[in-house]
Structure formats: structure tokens, C-alpha cells
């Protein structure tokens, strides 16, 4: 009888050790998988196939608890290289450097936010990229501070030749060049120069903007 009890105790100890070992191995595998997951951050370039609305929401979360912020993804399907030029901010700022080289089949990620502190600003600006044909792609984003008077807006335009983002470009894209309201709707537009675009922006103060530029 005593031998049976000893055998049972030994078996129980072995099973416990195996269970603990399996749990440890599972935890180590989970940690390894997490480490191997491609990290996302603003100011980077990813494969275009990875650019989804969910990825932009994840990117938005990296900015922390800021009430006015935006995560932007632009999928380059133009057939050529696009080269980052400059950013103009009407309000707010960014912690990112505009990605410099985005090959066709790649997507750029960029984030912007309101200025930190108790200041009544949103995240509003324009950035530009030079296309391989020598023209300029401009992207407007606008996440206002006060939703009693304003809404989210965005726009995309191709300018002839090389242009810098500045106040005049912002003013044209926001007021005159038929901007799109960020109202959770997909939009489509012919851009000229043999290109067209499709894009989506949502309506909250924590916004995402996804744009694809492609041949017409």
C-alpha cells in the first residue's frame, strides 16, 4: 500500500513538472512571436498589403491619450518611386519625419497630433511628395479642435511640377479644391496626369486616413 502511495506521489510530481514546463514553453513562444511581429510606427514605410484600417487604428494608439490626433497611410501604386518633400502645419505637430522614399507597392505611415498642453489646437496640415514624372502629390488632413464649428476634412491633389506644402496650398486644398469630409465614407477621384485615388477618413477626433494613389 505504501509503495502505491509513493508511486502516485512520484507520478503526480512528474505530471506537475511536465505541466509547468509546457506552460513555460508556451509563454516563451508567445513572447518570441510578439518580438518577431513587425513593429509599426509613424514615419516608416511598409509593404502596401499591410496597410489596413485596423493597422492605422493600432498606429493611432501609439500616440497615447491625446484628444486630437491622426494616423495616415498612403499606398503608392503609381508605378514609380515617390519622394518625400515637406510638411506644412496649420495647427498641431508631428513626432515623425516624413518617410523619404516610397517605392511602388509600398505605403508610407505618418502621424500628427495637437500640440501638447492645455491649448485649443487640432492637427491640420499638408504634406507633399514628388512623383516620378516630376509632378507633386499633396495630401491635406484636418482634425479640428472644436467640433461645434468644424468637421474632419481631407484632400488629395497632383500639382504640375515641384511644389512645396505651404499656407497657400493648405488654403486651396481646404477651401477651394473640393475637399472631402471625414464622415466614414470611401471617396474616389480622378487626379489628372494619368492618376486616380481612393480614400477613407473617419469622423472622430482620433482619426485615421487611408489613401491609395494608382494609375487611372
Curated annotation (Swiss-Prot):
Annotated signal peptide: 1-19
Gene Ontology terms: cellular component: extracellular region; nematocyst; other organism cell membrane; pore complex
Quaternary context: Octamer or nonamer in membranes. Monomer in the soluble state.
Protein's UniProt name: DELTA-sagatoxin-Srs1a
SUPFAM superfamilies cross-referenced by the UniProt entry: Cytolysin/lectin (SSF63724)
Family: Belongs to the actinoporin family. Sea anemone subfamily.
Keywords: Cytolysis, Ion transport, Membrane, Nematocyst, Secreted, Signal, Target cell membrane, Target membrane, Toxin, Transmembrane, Transport
GO biological process, one term: pore complex assembly
Chain segments annotated as coiled-coil in the UniProt record: none
Pfam families reported for this sequence: Anemone_cytotox
Sequence positions that bind phosphocholine: 91, 124, 142, 144, 170, 174-175
Domain of life (superkingdom): Eukaryota
UniProt-annotated location(s): Secreted; Nematocyst; Target cell membrane
Taxon lineage: Eukaryota, Metazoa, Cnidaria, Anthozoa, Hexacorallia
Region entry Plays an important role in the hemolytic activity, spans: 40-49
Naturally occurring in which organism (per UniProt): Sagartia rosea
Short sequence motif named Cell attachment site, crucial for protein stability, residue ranges: 181-183
Propeptide feature ranges: 20-38
Domain notes: Composed of a long N-terminal alpha-helix and a core region rich in beta-sheet structures. Before the pore formation, the alpha-helix binds the lipid membrane, partitions into the lipid-water interface and stabilizes the monomeric molecule on the membrane. Finally, it traverses the bilayer, thus forming the transmembrane pore.
Role played: Pore-forming protein that forms cations-selective hydrophilic pores of around 1 nm and causes cytolysis. Pore formation is a multi-step process that involves specific recognition of membrane sphingomyelin (but neither cholesterol nor phosphatidylcholine) using aromatic rich region and adjacent phosphocholine (POC) binding site, firm binding to the membrane (mainly driven by hydrophobic interactions) accompanied by the transfer of the N-terminal region to the lipid-water interface and finally pore formation after oligomerization of monomers.
Region of interest called Trp-rich region, which is important for the binding to lipid membrane, as start-end residue ranges on this chain: 142-157
MF-aspect GO terms: channel activity; toxin activity
Misc note: The partial protein sequence of PubMed:14680802 corresponds to the N-terminal amino acid sequence.
Residue numbers marked as site, Important in the initial contact with the lipid membrane: 150
InterPro entries: Actinoporin_PFT, Anemon_actinoporin-like, Cytolysin/lectin
